């Protein structure tokens, strides 16, 4: 049977995600961000609720990306997720994108010229942000010209890099309906951004989310719920450079900006520069919030849920892949579990996120 992998956040799960799943063939494996997502913010609802949404819409297996894969720039996010999906035996990696391109050919370009391309990237001036450097690299070697306002396309290129040299085929699907950041909605599709801004509108959620009942009833977490904890971390930590990827320049900028910032948006706005994008700053603040330091990624794969087909696939992997279905005395990934504890501070109605939790079985 064909095995299709999808890398996702489902923040929250909407009709566009359902459409993507419907286009996938064979067994459908989702590598999903945990309780913090790639752009450096808490997921609007917890990982278990989002896994349930995916299973109800046709996913066969949902696994959790570790924190230090979930909260990363596109290239590192893609590589970490593909590393995990490859171990689970995927044949295809499917993703939505704003651009209709031959990503397979782009992947081959990187496979043939990876060393030159990375050397070119490293030689670009530090005054450029990482996304700007990446855009310059693709323009130079593949003739691609794109803006930073198409995040799914940027991720598509990151996936092309990540699968280069692997026995995984890329399958891109044209993004349906509203753009990634769009606040508008058409007859069938609304962006995750629009949904996050309309959480108090049941009719809107019912129209654009297949599992609206789960989204409406699940405890929500947003940055403002955690901002006071971030302030505490910054004020009480003697050296912010101890946290993952925080350099001295950023540590100073963050401390100065905090004095006149009352919200996370104000803090990000004041810290960000041309070189340090807002997305990067949000990720750094998330690292500080959860106390992230450089750590090895876990060897095991944490399973959040499965269908009967997914269960059968897992049984074939036993002995070949370290599968984690219950987190007990021995941690799966201590940093992810630490991040989950911080996430729970955002809403007292949240259930325990790790201990005693077992994978969701679809239909039971």
UniProtKB/Swiss-Prot annotation:
Its EC number is 6.3.4.-. It catalyses: cytidine(34) in elongator tRNA(Met) + acetate + ATP = N(4)-acetylcytidine(34) in elongator tRNA(Met) + AMP + diphosphate. Belongs to the TmcAL family. HAMAP family: TmcAL. This is tRNA(Met) cytidine acetate ligase. The lineage of its organism: Bacteria, Bacillati, Bacillota, Bacilli, Lactobacillales. Gene3D superfamilies: HUPs (3.40.50.620). ATP binds at residues 7-20, 96, 152, 175. It comes from the Bacteria. The gene is tmcAL. Its main location: cytoplasm. GO terms for cellular component: cytoplasm. Keywords: ATP-binding, Cytoplasm, Ligase, Nucleotide-binding, RNA-binding, tRNA processing, tRNA-binding. Catalyzes the formation of N(4)-acetylcytidine (ac(4)C) at the wobble position of elongator tRNA(Met), using acetate and ATP as substrates. First activates an acetate ion to form acetyladenylate (Ac-AMP) and then transfers the acetyl group to tRNA to form ac(4)C34. It holds the Pfam family HIGH_NTase1. GO terms for molecular function: ATP binding; ligase activity, forming carbon-nitrogen bonds; tRNA binding. It is found in: Cytoplasm. GO terms for biological process: tRNA modification.
